[in-house]
Amino acid sequence: MRVSRNKLILSVLLISLALAGSASASSVTMTYQGHQGVVAKDGSPYIGYPYYVSINGSATLTPLMCDSYDNNVSLGQTWNATATPLLQGIANSMFGPAMTLDYKAAGLIFKSMLGGQMSTTAAQWAIWGLFSANASSNAYFISKNFGSIDAAYLTLAATASNSAFKGLVLYTPTGGRPGVGPQEFIGYSPVPEPGTLTMMGTGLISLAGFIRRKLARS
């Protein structure tokens, strides 16, 4: 009987820990499904965002922003990646922690685009330009002055609070590096407030204590 009680309590505690750690890194399988009818805009030579991807075989496609201009994926290609909250994922990202400010700027640009504050074309090229000299020296990039967007958002990123990056997810391809392997992507996935996760975890731990006391009386 004691073994069963201990197993029950342990199970509840493990559930609470899993919930508390739900925002950590996870390994995923990604399959590129194209742009789903979206076309290049404003004279851009490339479509860019959105790259629609099936994650772990899901029939619901996820629209993602590419940050690696010099890498490529082909329609139907499948690869493994690590999905991590943006700030946490920078340490093991494609471009590394030396580019932390650039990743932060990319995250802010992406959120601004999602909020309707800039076009998808401008956001895509600005993010490409942060990480690739080939992108930032492209005639189209220069003609549209996307470098001014980068400069503005690098300044914003320098003082932005961590909460500004909430919900951003970095998808880093396994074994990928600049110019080699699949692209790295940034996505957005609303997550529960940290306080909510803490309350859920605390509640489950309290429940475990309650169960333990009830079992002790039986």
Residue ranges and their predicted role:
Residues 208-218:
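C-terminal membrane-anchoring or membrane-association module
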Residues 4-6, 110, 165, 213:
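Generic cytosolic/nucleocytoplasmic N-terminal low-complexity/intrinsically disordered segments
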Residues 17-24, 156-159, 215:
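Residue-level detector of intrinsically disordered, flexible termini
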